[in-house]
Amino acid sequence: MSRKSIGEKRHSFSMRKLSVGLVSVTVSSFFLMSQGIQSVSADNMESPIHYKYMTEGKLTDEEKSLLVEALPQLAEESDDTYYLVYRSQQFLPNTGFNPTVGTFLFTAGLSLLVLLVSKRENGKKRLVHFLLLTSMGVQLLPASAFGLTSQILSAYNSQLSIGVGEHLPEPLKIEGYQYIGYIKTKKQDNTELSRTVDGKYSAQRDSQPNSTKTSDVVHSADLEWNQGQGKVSLQGEASGDDGLSEKSSIAADNLSSNDSFASQVEQNPDHKGESVVRPTVPEQGNPVSATTVQSAEEEVLATTNDRPEYKLPLETKGTQEPGHEGEAAVREDLPVYTKPLETKGTQGPGHEGEAAVREEEPAYTEPLATKGTQEPGHEGKATVREETLEYTEPVATKGTQEPEHEGEAAVEEELPALEVTTRNRTEIQNIPYTTEEIQDPTLLKNRRKIERQGQAGTRTIQYEDYIVNGNVVETKEVSRTEVAPVNEVVKVGTLVKVKPTVEITNLTKVENKKSITVSYNLIDTTSAYVSAKTQVFHGDKLVKEVDIENPAKEQVISGLDYYTPYTVKTHLTYNLGENNEENTETSTQDFQLEYKKIEIKDIDSVELYGKENDRYRRYLSLSEAPTDTAKYFVKVKSDRFKEMYLPVKSITENTDGTYKVTVAVDQLVEEGTDGYKDDYTFTVAKSKAEQPGVYTSFKQLVTAMQSNLSGVYTLASDMTADEVSLGDKQTSYLTGAFTGSLIGSDGTKSYAIYDLKKPLFDTLNGATVRDLDIKTVSADSKENVAALAKAANSANINNVAVEGKISGAKSVAGLVASATNTVIENSSFTGKLIANHQDSNKNDTGGIVGNITGNSSRVNKVRVDALISTNARNNNQTAGGIVGRLENGALISNSVATGEIRNGQGYSRVGGIVGSTWQNGRVNNVVSNVDVGDGYVITGDQYAAADVKNASTSVDNRKADRFATKLSKDQIDAKVADYGITVTLDDTGQDLKRNLREVDYTRLNKAEAERKVAYSNIEKLMPFYNKDLVVHYGNKVATTDKLYTTELLDVVPMKDDEVVTDINNKKNSINKVMLHFKDNTVEYLDVTFKENFINSQVIEYNVTGKEYIFTPEAFVSDYTAITNNVLSDLQNVTLNSEATKKVLGAANDAALDNLYLDRQFEEVKANIAEHLRKVLAMDKSINTTGDGVVEYVSEKIKNNKEAFMLGLTYMNRWYDINYGKMNTKDLSTYKFDFNGNNETSTLDTIVALGNSGLDNLRASNTVGLYANKLASVKGEDSVFDFVEAYRKLFLPNKTNNEWFKENTKAYIVEMKSDIAEVREKQESPTADRKYSLGVYDRISAPSWGHKSMLLPLLTLPEESVYISSNMSTLAFGSYERYRDSVDGVILSGDALRTYVRNRVDIAAKRHRDHYDIWYNLLDSASKEKLFRSVIVYDGFNVKDETGRTYWARLTDKNIGSIKEFFGPVGKWYEYNSSAGAYANGSLTHFVLDRLLDAYGTSVYTHEMVHNSDSAIYFEGNGRREGLGAELYALGLLQSVDSVNSHILALNTLYKAEKDDLNRLHTYNPVERFDSDEALQSYMHGSYDVMYTLDAMEAKAILAQNNDVKKKWFRKIENYYVRDTRHNKDTHAGNKVRPLTDEEVANLTSLNSLIDNDIINRRSYDDSREYKRNGYYTISMFSPVYAALSNSKGAPGDIMFRKIAYELLAEKGYHKGFLPYVSNQYGAEAFASGSKTFSSWHGRDVALVTDDLVFKKVFNGEYSSWADFKKAMFKQRIDKQDNLKPITIQYELGNPNSTKEVTITTAAQMQQLINEAAAKDITNIDRATSHTPASWVHLLKQKIYNAYLRTTDDFRNSIYK
């Protein structure tokens, strides 16, 4: 029985209702149907686009209005169909055949078009479908089928899969057609265009209630229908007048593979997106019937078609079409179904599109009968089956009706009676089961699932057959039994799947693990979700893809990079019923991992410290985990960063027995196996138990050894000497002589002793030490010091390796300070040795041993790599790379040394292997690659007999070592390998090595190898942050930035030009940073304060114009806790206290004046809180959050408070140096890492300075202290290198001298020569600065002996010192010496400075002129010798503020120049009341005389004669043997002290007016003495006048009586020096005496005066023996007529001076003067046997006599010296009548008269002299004893002056 649901529409079709055509045609069409419907194309992840091609002629006017005349552009998500319209361009000739007409006629002949009209309840009819019946088949078409379609071009139709946003392809080029545009339909609103019967279009939307639905075909067994009948159930159409949908379909499951039938399924809105499930049809053996469910209004009978039985199960295949997601796909081709078809109807409302569910009906037990069709009047209605009564009659067989007897009863013929027999039989029948369908909302729509398997029942019937003639004529049922069937229960799916969505609801960055956690919201109402993947993109690149195991759980994506912009997307896989489909969800999220934490990136060592017995000490191991870690902290050391002090959070025991120490600082992390983790942890070993003779504790070891010095002791663990506290006077850990054995290995493992502060042993006596490492030594002592022992006798040391720093005031060595008959083998030292001795006592410094002696001593197979500093200054002090002093048969063999030796004193007894082998030291098979500076690469002793063999080097040194063979590096390496040295430091400390780490930024993700330098520099700019951040900022450094190419040494925060060290107090004022590069340049970057980091102890600054940041390398703190602890202690320290003197090593009553720190000490103490903050900020990265750190640092300062104050004061006093606007005091005092030395501690260095002792801290030792204490931490070898390095950085465009001169407060005059060639040299000095007048260049020269001047000059607080520099001298003087009274006022302040400056300028010019003259006189070799630096001190005879003159001592604090310069320099000398000045050959000291006075300048030339005569003025010939130094100065080469002086000497200083009537010397000496020829010309002219006047005076006196002669003249004679060794007279002295009457009687002529050795009484003594080497002068106008000589040796003082000038005038400087005054002929004299014993030299020397000189100079020209002199007088007397006239101001008797007298003749001149002599005779005693009283003397001066003026200083002759 058929049921119809309420509102259900049914379409019934009946062949009888077709009003046009033949039934046969209609029927046959079902078998021949071949017209295909457009196939369903697959949906995919991309946008499906349909291209449908059609001709323009098919468009209506309305359609043409929708035409877009353009090409399709970009694909949009809403696109559906493009109708591509073409215009035909082909016009074929008319052949009488019209294809359209032909097609129509052909189609009309083979087809029948049936219009299906729907009748509505309101009586209206509408066209529903076209039923096209053809001979090839049937096609049910919707009314809209003829809309936008064209069969002409349909072959080109296509479906495209185009990504949204991609370009659509251009339409095809079709031959004969022109593309003109397109019409587009969209799918976003599911609107479809349909053309109604009247040609109008209407839009239909799925969302509207009247939208058209298509039908699903469902197969089921139905016992209600007879075999061969079928039922087609189609979902009815909703009511409404809307146009027909373009999409329409009918069921196609009954089509064969040859009867392709396409069906489109339109989905219920309630199930849109769900997959349609096509049930699998089981194999059926029974016919299948099709049932049509009809509506009340529209019924059409349908026919059934018999098909062969289908053997295979049915299932739904195919992809989905747009708009039908979730529906079952229509399979286009199916195999031929061979069974009858049964079509189930569709379900009622709410179940559209679903398989019909048949209600369960009772089993049908009656016979089946086939009903015919309905009778007229019942068309379209179901056949009514009348109830049939039970048949009780015998069964009769009816035949089939014959033709033309249809409907008539069959004619039964009568048959004869037959015999009837019976037969019993049993018939078993199957009772078919029924199928019950249950809707399952969890099962995909149209899918079926057998919930319960059906089972057929059985019916057993017993029959009795009646047989007649062998035929059964009747059968009678005897019995019947039944087994009921089990009904089959089938679940039918109603689920229509929709595409699930996965939305990212949350993204959490887990930055420490480089990962993210993503949370999702999966919306999957229909369980279509299959899987999903999280995809991470960097730009367009997929970098990470992770399967989402459970969308409900958080998804972790790891392995990401920091500072990379990422996008996270979700790639979804789902299934809507058929195949898996994929797409990328629209829910995305951008993110970037940014990680900024504090990380300790590089660790060389990590040390645990804790408090024990009221002191902090280091722990190498722990016996248990402490419960309270407040008193513990950690030191982290690195060569790349400052040492860090960090608090301990916890200490716990690990499972392996070690202890885990956790360091906690806010934001501190370390990298683990899966990313970063909080805090930093390291391990500490567990302490081992002690065993007899085996030790694991240093304290127990020392205690045991001290109790038994002859025992055997073995180490079983690494240990630290920090366990033991030493007494103040303790110089070693063990006292006494150790005779036992110390073994550093237990046989399986070697161990080390750490942290020695003193030598382990005092003495090793026959002891053995082997297999031991001694590490991190930090020993300092005022006694002999070494790591292992102070002394060793007959000891054996093997396989001992030492590493650390050792310093001392006496002998210093790596292993043993002093050894005798000791063997040291296979051992090594690595580190620093500092010998800071300040005296001249014996000491030796060596890398292995200081001094080793004895034939049994051997140093074999040792290695040294060390920096050694020494103050070796004499033969008692040595330094060597391996041994300082090697003597008495001791041997060094098979050993190698590398490193550097710095000798602050420049003494050369320093060697790369050994300082000295004197005597009998032996060296064999050694290699030295040591930079020895002023020493030698192998041995400091270079005597040829030294026993040094097979010594090699591959480096170059300043000095050539006679024993060194130069080899290549490869050769050196091979030689060292052959030595077989196996000692190593690497075999111990394994537990500590586990805590080491290093970073290589180039190995990190996103790092670029070529940016290695940039990463290193960014590390400097932000040292605390994690390495990934370093790489991130490093990648932002421009390739043009210097940070990209050049390595940084340090970064210094600044405020303008001020270095900022107190960062906490000035953090907001920091506005730039200084970048110090390794190429010795600096650059500056502007910065602005950005913020405090999360850990507020780290602060950040933005760098202007850059993408990176800056953070100072300091945990910013005000250090309140520490300062509160120590401030009062520091403020109570006094400089002169006993405690301070104890630290200095000075006696309680010792004065500390020579420190010159008084003023600065008080200034530092007054501001100690600020200084302390600077020290702590720059010292280490001190984190003050831990109590242990605060207490440790506080105790360290308090325990060393005196040393701390001394060191801090010292640095503030001597390093307060300016470089233009830049003051470097803070940089020098606190920034010890400025040169990249990150291992240096500011606090430790300052304390070490204070502890270095009084001698080291003396102001005069600033150069030595730098070399010993600061060079290694500052990175420059000398203090000069240090200040020059700063100059190069901060004033690169200035020279050292320019900077020095600008920044010292001393008044400096550098007087360059007026000689062009000299000035050129001085202005362009050579590399050795030989010609430079720059004060800095000169005091920094290697030859300068007063280098301690540097820092006092640079730090002078005021102008109180002057410096005058010229070609040969460097003069220093104090302003206080010239505090004169001017106009009754004692000069001070600016007036004094102006006064002194003026005098300095004048004196400097005079000194310059003096040396210019000498430069002009000398040969080229001697000229070069003038370029030197002889120090001149102006003395300490100063005046105080009251004008009182006194000799100041260096402790005088009232004289600024003493306190600030002369005192600190340490250059002082005692007062000498009898000395104006003195010299010693290399310096000049003024005492009574003042350098800047006019007379003082003359004295200056006097002293410089002493410093220059022998080697320079005498051109290397030396002084003539037998003549003292003073003969060469006063009265010979010393400049006159005035141009008015009557002394026979040269004016080399003063300039005067040319027409000065009083001058007696040249008015411009530089111009006049511009060559030796000019000098001779001048002197010859001078002697022309003097000889003439002397002859006239002789004539005037010889005319007098003998009494006058006797008073006027004196006789000069020789006395002799007796050579007692050779028993002979040698050198002469002069004496004068009065004449006897007999002698006077012989004086009758000029020649008689010469022959009788007569001199004038005037200007000489009446009677005197002139001591040799005296201060004498010769008067130009008091004649010496004598020609006295000495044939036995050198002449006396008077005659020497007189004859020297006469030779200068006659023969010149080189041909007359030098041969006479110098030892030019000494070699010749000595060779000839003329010699004498010199007590000065202690040997025989040449005896150069006057006779030899005379012979050599005159070469036979004269017969004697007297003959020479007579000739000189005669030469002038012969020309006197040719004298040029002169005019003088002269009036006898009136000395001040201006009366002019013109002298025109010699006679007139003679007359004037006669008159003057007569005047003197009247007052003869006075006139001859007091030169100014002599009128002759005055007249001669006036005549001489007149000729001097008229001849232009004798440039012209006095003769006509």
UniProtKB/Swiss-Prot annotation:
Example GO biological process: proteolysis
Parts of the chain that traverse the membrane: 97-117, 130-152
EC number: 3.4.24.-
Residues covered by the G5 domain: 417-496
Start and end residues of each stretch annotated as Disordered: 254-362
Stretches with biased composition (Basic and acidic residues): 322-334, 351-361
Compartments reported by the entry: Secreted, Cell wall; Membrane
Active site: E1503
Chain positions recorded as Zn(2+) binding sites: H1502, H1506, E1526
Signal peptide: 1-42
Extracellular topological intervals: 153-1856
Keyword terms: Cell wall, Hydrolase, Membrane, Metal-binding, Metalloprotease, Peptidoglycan-anchor, Protease, Secreted, Signal, Transmembrane, Transmembrane helix, Virulence, Zinc
Chain intervals with Polar residues compositional bias: 254-267, 286-295
Cofactor field: Zn(2+)
One of the record's GO molecular function terms: zinc ion binding
Record function comment: Zinc metalloproteinase that specifically cleaves human matrix metalloproteinase 9 (MMP-9), leading to its activation. May play a role in pneumococcal virulence and pathogenicity in the lung.
Family: Belongs to the peptidase M26 family.
Identification of the protein by name: Zinc metalloprotease ZmpC
Species of the source: Streptococcus pneumoniae serotype 4 (strain ATCC BAA-334 / TIGR4)
Protein encoded by which gene: zmpC
